[in-house]
């Protein structure tokens, strides 16, 4: 079991740079992108589509994990253009057995390796910051693309509790991530 940090070292997201991405603290202006995602049929794997009010509650509660837990979502933007590309991060709302590595990308960012690049950076950050030896994905069994990505990132399917009893749980060994 992964323990939550005893002290909150990161009340706000640090900036993480990769070859193509800038991972940063989400800001209010990012909500329009989240709202668009949650209104779209692509959000079905997260329980959507959602109304604007529901999307706001999800967005605000996820961003609120930073001061409460010391981790949360990062907004991903293109380093060259500043274009918003999606979100990647560590989530643990009430009821999740352990912190989860999750992601979503805008429709225009799909198929470009954006989620993978962001996820690798977050895994390395989690290992370096918290010393965790693993992190899981909790993925709806119908979400073949996210399952494939979790496996491409080096994760393995394990029999462990997820956020939902039907979730496919993919575990990533972080010991080589930092």
Report residues per predicted region.
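Extracellular/periplasmic catalytic domains that process cell-envelope and extracellular macromolecules
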Residues: 67
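Beta-strand acidic-aromatic groove motif in beta-rich domains, primarily in extracellular
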Residues: 70
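Acyl-donor (CoA/ACP) binding surface of acyl/acetyltransferases
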Residues: 1-46, 56, 60, 64, ...
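PAS/PAS-like sensory domain cap-loop motif
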Residues: 48-50
